[in-house]
């Protein structure tokens, strides 16, 4: 129970307004990452047209960037990049000798085995016979759910 007036349906309720964004640095970081994602999506679509990949999860994205603000940002969020780009793997090459601000993006077909649950391509699947065909991440997620 929540005090106060309510609409007839939750779908008619209004979201509370926010005066200011609390962490402007975080917002700036994610805006830059979304710009990179736009470039990655263009490269993915090009390789899809060339029939190199089918879905984006069937791809490995290789990014080469200079050692600077963008390079540091990509390194900081490295573990989240495959989920952000919806690909199986991201290979990051930060080059201190590269003076160009250009981002080099290369898309290749992913190798390895396809997880039956998340459809990512991984080097090996779990060895647990009760979770056959799953990557370790999915096997762990199912174990957490069962034991919770």
Where are these regions (language model features)?
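Flanking scaffold residues of small Cys/His-coordinated metal-binding clusters
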Residues: 110-113, 130
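Short metal-binding segments enriched for Cys and/or His
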Residues: 142-148
């Amino acid at each position: 129970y929540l005090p106060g007036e309510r609409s007839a349906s939750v779908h008619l309720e209004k979201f509370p307004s926010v005066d200011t964004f609390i962490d402007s640095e975080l917002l700036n970081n994610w805006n830059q990452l979304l710009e990179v994602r736009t470039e990655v999506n263009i490269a993915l679509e090009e390789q899809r047209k060339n029939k190199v990949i089918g879905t984006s999860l069937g791809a490995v994205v290789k990014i080469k960037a200079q050692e600077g603000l963008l390079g540091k940002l990509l390194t900081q969020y490295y573990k989240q990049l495959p989920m952000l780009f919806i690909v199986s793997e991201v290979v990051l090459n930060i080059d201190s000798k590269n003076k160009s601000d250009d981002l080099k993006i290369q898309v290749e077909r992913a190798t390895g085995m396809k997880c039956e649950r998340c459809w990512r391509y991984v080097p090996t699947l779990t060895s647990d016979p009760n979770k056959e065909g799953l990557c370790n991440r999915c096997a762990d997620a199912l174990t957490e759910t069962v034991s919770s």
